Amino acid sequence: MSEKFSGGCDHINTHSSSDPIDNHTCHCSVCKRVTGQPTTHVAFFNHGDLEVDNPQKMNKQPFNDQNPDGPLELCTCSECGTPIMLDDKLGRIRAIVPNIMGYDEGFPAPTYHAFYDPATGVPRPDDGREVYEGLRKDFVWPPEK
């Protein structure tokens, strides 16, 4: 099957022939800290659907430095430092941030807003997409591997 999506850097390639299982604009404080962006486009894939070429070249560190034992690890290239993906230690998902992880501008747009917190004082998004304080209500985490 041909690849629908491909990203990464000159040393590590990630690719998938499957659609993401979730595709949202994230408003969480962790994404803001890690990316430096006010909101972050995040796409989740089933763990086995996002393949990695040359995984031995990845450095892994906790995605959330305030919860270093959490399940998500930020994977970066050991040669150039490019962020490659988020890997779930439980084997459920792999996630990408298309605009900083080497994906082209044709990547599908986010379908909703996740982790919006009105207490931050940031105006509620009004672009016509649903807004949730967590992930969308019908999202089901894949089973652990």
Positions of PLM-derived features:
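A short Gly-Trp-Pro
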Residues: 1-6, 12-145
